[in-house]
Amino acid sequence: MVNFTAEEKTLINGLWSKVNVEEVGGEALGRLLVVYPWTQRFFDSFGNLSSASAIMGNPRVKAHGKKVLTAFGESIKNLDNLKSALAKLSELHCDKLHVDPENFKLLGNVLVIVLASHFGNEFTAEMQAAWQKLVAGVATALSHKYH
């Protein structure tokens, strides 16, 4: 279980309130598929994933990225109980989709990079530390069903 300080919660929620879920979600998922091409096997139905430009411009990637980040936002509302908040998604990704849980860590790290690029100097070292803690906690919660 991850325990967030009041300061970490403030940093996470403060930045989250400024995040364009559609834009950041699409970019994060797109970058995951470009940087870690083996993750594309989970998205066969998305059509053309043949190049970085095809992936980043793919409307299905963008739409699913928004869906992923929307679910991520729900976890932010439940920082004190990520495991419970993400239990159904953990079950779905384990039992039905058979996603390698390592991919949750990869996507979390990509998300931090995308946030840093979008928020520049506002994304301080303290902000990064809080978000790294969050994405690690989300990855652990999503991996729970696998154990």
Curated annotation (Swiss-Prot):
One of the entry's Gene Ontology molecular-function terms is:
oxygen binding
Q: Does the keyword Iron apply?
A: yes
GO terms under biological process: carbon dioxide transport; negative regulation of transcription by RNA polymerase II; oxygen transport
Q: Which positions does the record annotate as the modified residue Phosphoserine? A: S51
Print the keywords alphabetically: Heme, Iron, Metal-binding, Oxygen transport, Phosphoprotein, Transport
Q: Provide the family line.
A: Belongs to the globin family.
Which residues does UniProt call coiled coil?
none
> May I ask which residue range the UniProt record assigns to the signal sequence?
none
Q: What does this protein do?
A: Hemoglobin epsilon chain is a beta-type chain found in early embryos.
The molecule here is called Hemoglobin subunit epsilon-Y2
Tissue expression notes: High expression in yolk sac blood islands, fetal liver, and embryonic erythrocytes. Very low levels in adult liver and spleen.
Concerning PROSITE patterns, the annotation shows: GLOBIN
Globin domain location is 3-147
Enumerate the SUPFAM superfamilies for this protein: Globin-like
Amino acids binding heme b: H64, H93
**A cellular component term, taken from the record's GO annotations:** hemoglobin complex
Question: Would you say which domain of life the source belongs to?
Answer: Eukaryota
